[in-house]
């Protein structure tokens, strides 16, 4: 028993320096972050609607007896499913104290059976587009504002401490979601999640770029890490909707909180976040990176591709409740095809994109996103959403798995190979999509309708696609070109950082990979 314990401790000690274990930590952090991001998608619209109408339903029950005139009788007809009201000559009192004289008349009231899950033609439901959109956008807005600071922080103190801070904040946010019973507390929990997400995503992607220094090799681990994001998006909505309907609102968040604790324990042991590990060289200033047109094109692709699904998240469940009479569990399951296809897309094109050209992969992805989004309003039921949602997810997977590695490649090619700031920009682009998408999407859906909302974002994605052509062969800066000519190596980029890899170093079993 003691020998097995020693073997386990030795394995853990050796694994601490493994790139694969670091990849697993980033994968798990992105998985849980995006599960929390999407688990609220089917819960919040229905939960806010139920909170708002609990009071209204109580008031209706107390006022309903006043509407019945004592001299009236009702006869239900099974022939045509209608109710005939027969009233005699009498004077009754209507709500508000108004006097009303009834005569002997017959009023036929058609009985239409409307499911309780189908609040169509409800003005409150239409207005909820804006409220839900702002709630969803708050996380991305806070993350958008926090990312530049996290990028600079990682350059100064390294990646482990911000990574662990992201875990702590996400745990607090998850518990707040579980026990929040008002819109204000939900808004605070969602905003707090934005800070935690910023720490996890910027530090995580920067950490991967620093340990996988070869451009061709880097695509695969980043595709796997984005697979964690995809898994979170995949599992979140159905996981949340099923537990919400059959267990309650608190259940999905408590399960997530337990998983987040597990992630924190692994980070604490492997990354040792108490140690400050600054970068060995000074990175390119954030303002300089923001002036690079090639970085801006890559960031724009990430932003507009993800803006499509971000607009769908608050608007699609409400549109389904209004037009399809969808049940609670269906509101989350509708996103399942997009989530599955995103997972497929990131894993396939994480490897394939480098061979076919990342610019071409992103260009095709933007076009497919636009076409798929344009098809969504034509769906008449939940089955009609399968194909377009599958196309949306698959295409966004193409874009993300192409553009995330190319951000690191552009820094290697044109700037100093320090990755915190450039992945802060990538995450800012992602967050802009998720900040502008829900907030603007909710307002547009309320003003001109859901179909026009889909038309607008679909056209924007297709129009942006040709700009990806400029990423086909981005030029190197003069000093970088001199290095390339000296080493006579126009493709491999690993010489830029192979002497500056941080101390989550490569294990003995993997040193041969970097030779």
Curated annotation (Swiss-Prot):
> Where is this protein localized, as stated in its record?
Cytoplasmic vesicle, Secretory vesicle, Synaptic vesicle membrane; Cytoplasmic vesicle, Secretory vesicle membrane; Cell projection, Axon; Cell projection, Dendrite
Q: From which domain of life does this come? A: Eukaryota
Q: Tell me which parts of the chain lie in the Lumenal, vesicle compartment.
A: 42-130, 182-190, 244-249, 313-329, 380-390, 437-441
| Biological processes, Gene Ontology terms | aminergic neurotransmitter loading into synaptic vesicle; cellular response to ammonium ion; cellular response to xenobiotic stimulus; endocytic recycling; histamine secretion by mast cell; histamine uptake; insulin secretion; locomotory behavior
InterPro entries assigned: MFS (IPR011701), MFS_dom (IPR020846), MFS_trans_sf (IPR036259), MFS_Vesicular_Transporter (IPR050930), Multidrug-R (IPR004734)
Q: Does the keyword Zinc-finger apply?
A: no
Q: What does this protein do?
A: Electrogenic antiporter that exchanges one cationic monoamine with two intravesicular protons across the membrane of secretory and synaptic vesicles. Uses the electrochemical proton gradient established by the V-type proton-pump ATPase to accumulate high concentrations of monoamines inside the vesicles prior to their release via exocytosis. Transports a variety of catecholamines such as dopamine, adrenaline and noradrenaline, histamine, and indolamines such as serotonin. Regulates the transvesicular monoaminergic gradient that determines the quantal size.
This chain belongs to the protein called Synaptic vesicular amine transporter
Q: What is the lineage of its organism?
A: Eukaryota, Metazoa, Chordata, Craniata, Vertebrata
